[in-house]
């Protein structure tokens, strides 16, 4: 038993609180005491022990059995890797092949899934053992499972962009994950009376951390599938009302969407909410402030708004404000070749316990005037051991995040990114991976594809693919690009723009000018 499995066991077996899970078909919530969830997790841990798996893959919705599968892997001392399910527009066979290959490539040997996801995965030829989590986790236990030595070194294998924008897997040890959970709990002031409510995907570090915080804290949490929010976004606010949640978390786009259309809301009571984390993507000041103002008529305290900073390499949280501070804004002047302009940026709080932040000065200051801008570097107890397949990160070593920022008395401010990531709905997406996949489509010119994020601070940021194309069937090729990217990357492009050969802007050395492509696309959209 490692420190994380011991903490989970102690909390779940002594807690009187519940895990409350949303059932999409009936649109009802179902309570499961943490003690019962622990028994289900023991069943999963036992099966993993029989398989001898040091790394376990999870695919599916956050059913009680799905949650038990995650916790069971952690109880067994195995590393858990969670991947997205099938998304709209994806080819089922391509998705299943891609998912199983991704698991195999990071050392996963046992997979847990359920329902249609399970059925599709089992149609593919794979050496991985694939279990039905509903079957394994639902079995009755007559004895308490005696946990032996951990089956592996790591607790979480988290997909990430890395500091260079290259797809990587962060390897997180049990002590690092637990340190992050405890540091976050201390900053938030987590108490036994707190109630969480989340629809965040568990394959995202923010969603997984929100769930594990409740499990380790033994507190009540309400967990809905991301698909339930996507199909009816205003459900989130009604879930907060029904649960009397004190804690929630979401990416910027969710706060912007609800705030923009809040006039549609009725019968809402958010007076219990004391901490609403905003993370995973750049913070839109106006949209976030509007959420606080508009929802205050339903009892929401704008002081609960908590823009924060984190990344998978640090388990999740790095800087988080103290509850009650609310949205803090720093106004800056930015100079470019076109002149000067002012921008308002969110202050993201100070480092949680065990973590440190510093700035590494460089040439890239993002044009910010009167601020000491540098690349954000972090270190501390929550840090990963390193990326899979690469040299380990030495304890105490400063890790360059690729983000540009500066420090104020109220905390960290992020003003730009060195790494060319695309952020959609809180997810970091890798341009090179999308471009490689799109280039497989007949007629699309290899090496002449650019994937960019557009309107990143808007309510609905999107992924746009621009490619040079030559062929008779543009419509068919466009559909195939969407299908392939959806299947293998788990995100549906907002648009695919085909251009004549030679149209994409390049540098004198022949490199594609991504920022110029992004600017042209945004201008063309008006």
Curated annotation (Swiss-Prot):
EC nos: 6.2.1.20, 6.2.1.47
Processing and modification events after translation: Acetylated on Lys-511 and Lys-260 by Pat. Lys-511 is the major acetylation site. Acetylation results in the inactivation of the enzyme.
Modified residues (N6-acetyllysine): 260, 511
Gene name of this polypeptide: mbtM
Cystine crosslinks: none
Record's catalysed reaction(s): a long-chain fatty acid + holo-[ACP] + ATP = a long-chain fatty acyl-[ACP] + AMP + diphosphate; a medium-chain fatty acid + holo-[ACP] + ATP = a medium-chain fatty acyl-[ACP] + AMP + diphosphate; hexadecanoate + holo-[ACP] + ATP = hexadecanoyl-[ACP] + AMP + diphosphate; hexadecanoate + ATP + H(+) = hexadecanoyl-AMP + diphosphate
Native species: Mycolicibacterium smegmatis (strain ATCC 700084 / mc(2)155)
Activity regulation text: Reversibly inactivated by post-translational acetylation by Pat in a cAMP-dependent manner and reactivated by Sir2 deacylase.
Protein name, per record: Medium/long-chain-fatty-acid--[acyl-carrier-protein] ligase MbtM
Biochemical pathway: Siderophore biosynthesis; mycobactin biosynthesis
Top EC group: ligase
GO molecular function, one term: adenylyltransferase activity
NCBIfam families on file: PRK05851.1
Family according to the record: Belongs to the ATP-dependent AMP-binding enzyme family.
UniProt keyword annotations, A-Z: Acetylation, ATP-binding, Ligase, Nucleotide-binding
Transmembrane segments: none
Gene3D superfamilies associated with the record: 3.30.300.30, N-terminal domain of ligase-like
GO CC annotation: plasma membrane
Matches recorded under InterPro entries: AMP-bd_C_sf, AMP-binding_CS, AMP-dep_synth/lig_dom, ANL_N_sf
Function, as annotated: Activates lipidic moieties required for mycobactin biosynthesis. Converts medium- to long-chain aliphatic fatty acids into acyl adenylate, which is further transferred on to the phosphopantetheine arm of the carrier protein MbtL. Shows a strong preference for palmitic acid (C16) and cannot use short-chain fatty acids. Proceeds via a Bi Uni Uni Bi ping-pong mechanism. During the first half-reaction (adenylation), fatty acid binds first to the free enzyme, followed by ATP and the release of pyrophosphate to form the adenylate intermediate.
């Amino acid at each position: 038993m490692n420190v994380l499995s011991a903490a989970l066991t102690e909390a779940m077996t002594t807690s009187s609180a519940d895990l409350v899970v949303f059932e999409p078909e009936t649109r009802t919530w179902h309570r499961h005491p943490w003690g019962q969830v622990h028994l289900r997790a023991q069943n999963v841990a036992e099966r993993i022990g029989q398989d001898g798996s040091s790394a376990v893959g999870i695919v599916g919705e956050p059913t009680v059995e799905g949650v038990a599968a995650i916790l069971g892997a952690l109880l067994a001392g195995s590393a858990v890797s969670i991947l997205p399910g099938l998304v709209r527009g994806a080819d089922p066979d391509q998705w299943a092949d891609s998912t199983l290959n991704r698991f195999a490539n990071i050392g996963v040997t046992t997979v847990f899934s359920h329902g249609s996801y399970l059925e599709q995965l089992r149609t593919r030829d794979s050496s991985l053992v694939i279990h039905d989590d509903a079957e394994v986790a639902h079995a009755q236990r007559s004895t308490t499972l005696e946990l032996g030595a951990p089956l592996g070194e790591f607790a979480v294998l988290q997909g990430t962009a890395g500091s260079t924008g290259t797809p990587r897997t962060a390897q997180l040890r049990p002590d690092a994950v637990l340190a992050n959970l405890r540091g976050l709990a201390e900053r938030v002031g987590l108490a036994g009376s707190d109630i969480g409510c989340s629809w965040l995907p568990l394959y995202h570090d923010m969603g997984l951390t929100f769930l594990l915080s409740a499990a380790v804290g033994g507190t009540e949490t309400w967990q809905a599938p991301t698909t339930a929010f996507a199909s009816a976004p205003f459900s989130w606010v009604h879930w907060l009302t029904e649960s009397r949640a004190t804690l929630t978390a979401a990416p910027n786009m969710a706060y912007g969407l609800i705030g923009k259309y809040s006039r549609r809301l009725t019968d809402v009571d958010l007076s219990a909410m004391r901490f609403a984390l905003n993370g995973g993507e750049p913070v839109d000041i106006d949209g976030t402030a509007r959420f606080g103002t508009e929802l205050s008529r339903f009892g929401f305290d704008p002081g609960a708004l908590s823009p924060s900073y984190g990344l998978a390499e640090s388990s999740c949280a790095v800087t988080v404000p103290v509850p009650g501070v609310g949205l803090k804004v720093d106004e800056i002047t930015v100079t470019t070749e076109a002149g000067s302009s002012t921008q308002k940026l969110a202050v993201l709080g100070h480092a949680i316990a065990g973590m440190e932040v510093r700035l590494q000065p460089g040439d890239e200051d993002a044009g910010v005037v009167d601020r000491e801008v540098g690349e954000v570097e972090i270190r501390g107890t929550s840090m990963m051991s390193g990326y899979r397949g690469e040299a380990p990160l030495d304890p105490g070593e400063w890790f360059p995040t690729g983000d540009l920022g500066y420090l104020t008395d109220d905390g960290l401010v992020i003003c730009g990114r060195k790494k060319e990531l695309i952020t959609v709905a809180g997810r970091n997406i890798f341009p090179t991976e999308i471009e490689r996949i799109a280039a497989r489509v007949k007629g699309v010119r290899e090496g002449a594809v650019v994937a960019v994020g557009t309107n990143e601070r808007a309510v609905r940021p999107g992924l746009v693919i621009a490619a040079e194309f030559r062929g008779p069937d543009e419509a068919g090729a466009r559909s195939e690009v969407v299908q392939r990217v959806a299947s293998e990357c788990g995100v549906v492009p907002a648009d695919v723009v085909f251009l004549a050969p030679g149209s994409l802007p390049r540098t004198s050395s022949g490199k594609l000018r991504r920022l110029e492509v992004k600017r042209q696309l945004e201008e063309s959209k008006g």
